[in-house]
Amino acid sequence: MNKMSENIKTIENMEYLQGEESMEKAITDNEWKKPIKDLWEMCSDSMVWVYPDFGTEAFLSEIYKQSTTYFDIGREIQVIVDSNNNLFMSVGSPGFVSFANQEDELYGTKEPMRLPIKCWIHTHPNFNAYFSGTDWKTVDSWHGDLESAIVLGKSEIWAYDCATEIGKHIQFIKTSSGRRTVTDGEE
């Protein structure tokens, strides 16, 4: 192996270790959950998952905000709402999220997760909202125990009703206001 190859390998190893340290920190730091839980306490009784209303959109926006702004890099977050209206949350890499190394979120709570799951929400930080092949496999594997699934992306919400297999795609577009100043004599 020449010196250049050795240097590249050393840099790759350092990047890998930094990524591992960064992931460990993301898993152990639970402060990102607080704003989500706080908003949940205010609006949990009125959530409309498949056809999100203003309150639901505000809650979903907070989840997406945490996934893109709280961590060192944009990280996927998943939030599960069980049949008792309890939240179960985990954080992952920019491209994948699971409960690996975060099992306490599922089993270390006062009240364990109860099926069916009302909604499985996860983010695609800084990307479009879409259901990937992995996402569809997750939806299919929970068939009968999952009522709805939502993917949050950059200015987008993709909500899916598992029973009807109907989805709703919402895209937020910032437009100019269209306002102009009315001068004397115009109306």
Report each predicted region and the residues it spans:
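Conserved beta-strand-loop surface patch within small alpha/beta domains used
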Residues: 2-119, 126-187
